[in-house]
Amino acid sequence: VFLLISSIAAAGTSEGRLRTEMDAVNPISHYGRSKRTGELAAAALADRIPVTILRPPFVFGGGDRSGFYIFRPIKRFGIHPVPGMRHRRKISLVHAKDLADSILLAAQRGTRVDPADASCDHFRQGCYFVCDDATPFYSDLGDMIGTALGKTGILKLPVPDALARTAGGLATIVSQLRGRPGVFSLDKAREGAAGSWICSSEKIKQELGFKTKASLEDRLQETVDWYLERGWF
């Protein structure tokens, strides 16, 4: 079995409801388009090898450096930068341990991609979103992390989309000069301005019996404890 770990970025944002595997894809970033290209390349091989695709959203957990940059300003300054001016964008998340469980389930019992779907805008089978059921507003995620850190009164700092894109553009230039990618970029700013990144894990729960082993709050606490114990802050 060939398991491709793709991303919700390959599918795109969703407003007003959870994105499902049957929705037409609409990637809005270079990262998302590259992930979608990988999906189609894998699907083109599905007549020769069994292929299953997983699409996690924001992955977090101990040891993760990219997610750490969300936690750090909350710990150090009590500030949570929020894309946009109205704080109404939601986010789906999955802890790395739960994602690992889903990978094993998909390898053992998952359906496989139909090679005919390589020319379609969605996969009818063999593709799963995997996430926690909670879909908090990104602004509220700051309060949840603050609670895990024992901090209250977290300041949600609205970052206008234009400012985020400017900062992302500068960060991209710096990364190119340094010769290695950074955590923040113009592409990430583009994703942050696009809307809500929320998806449904109903399919993987129904077909494979997937379930997260702890609540989102407990997983955030576990992650904070990992960072604290190892002095990352």
Where are these regions (language model features)?
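Mid/C-terminal beta-alpha module of Rossmann-like enzyme folds, strongest
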Residues: R109-V183, Q221-E222
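A conserved pocket-lining segment of Rossmann-fold NAD(P)-dependent short-chain dehydrogenase/reductase
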Residues: R72-D98, S102-A106, G110, D114-R124, ...
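Conserved C-terminal active-site "lid" loop/helix of NAD(P)H-dependent oxidoreductases
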Residues: A96, C120, C127, G169-K211
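Non-catalytic, hydrophobic alpha-helical segments
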Residues: L99, I103, V130, L141, ...
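Amphipathic terminal alpha-helices
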Residues: C199-E207, K211-F233
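Conserved Rossmann-fold NAD(P)-dependent oxidoreductase catalytic core, especially the SDR/UDP-sugar
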Residues: V1-H30, A44, T52
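Active-site helix of classical SDR
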Residues: S34
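Conserved beta-loop-beta element that borders a ligand/cofactor-binding pocket
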Residues: E39-G62
